[in-house]
């Protein structure tokens, strides 16, 4: 079986909070997944610029996203989802904040689900359940789960 990756991003959750929250599930994720207690954000430490940097491996000054307002890049670059697609990997995204869809090219995510956190109670729970269901049914190579109700 090929290795699979699930990237879970919980908006506003600092590394020190992961270590001290004491929740059994968070502890299990930390102990069995990849976690960096020394992680730091980009400047500015704002959601859209930070996640764009995660997906494109460059700072905001290079990708051009410096606020939570999306602007098409002047100098497009190939990002994580594009590289995975070129390697014939199947990608999926589950997210609760609409601007997040800009951190990948829409065609690169074979499966994508947006649940509006402002219109749906428990959007994080719904997204998580849908992600788990898809993982069981389709076994995607890469799953991005963005949780916003923090």
What label would you give each PLM region?
Residues 2-4, 12-138:
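Active-site-proximal alpha/beta segments of enzymes that process anionic O-linked groups
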């Amino acid at each position: 079986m090929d290795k699979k990756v699930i990237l879970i991003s919980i908006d506003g959750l600092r590394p020190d909070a992961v270590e001290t929250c004491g929740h059994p599930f968070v502890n299990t994720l930390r102990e069995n997944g990849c976690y960096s207690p020394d992680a730091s954000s980009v400047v500015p430490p704002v959601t859209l610029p930070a996640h764009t940097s995660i997906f494109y491996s460059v700072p905001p000054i290079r990708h051009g996203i410096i606020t939570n307002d999306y602007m098409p890049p002047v100098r497009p670059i190939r990002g994580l989802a594009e590289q995975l697609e070129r390697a014939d990997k199947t990608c999926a995204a589950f997210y609760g904040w609409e601007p997040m869809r800009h951190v990948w090219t829409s065609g690169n995510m074979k499966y994508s689900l947006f649940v509006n956190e402002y219109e749906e109670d428990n959007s994080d729970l719904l997204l998580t359940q849908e992600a788990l269901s898809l993982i069981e049914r389709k076994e995607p190579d890469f799953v991005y789960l963005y949780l916003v109700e923090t």
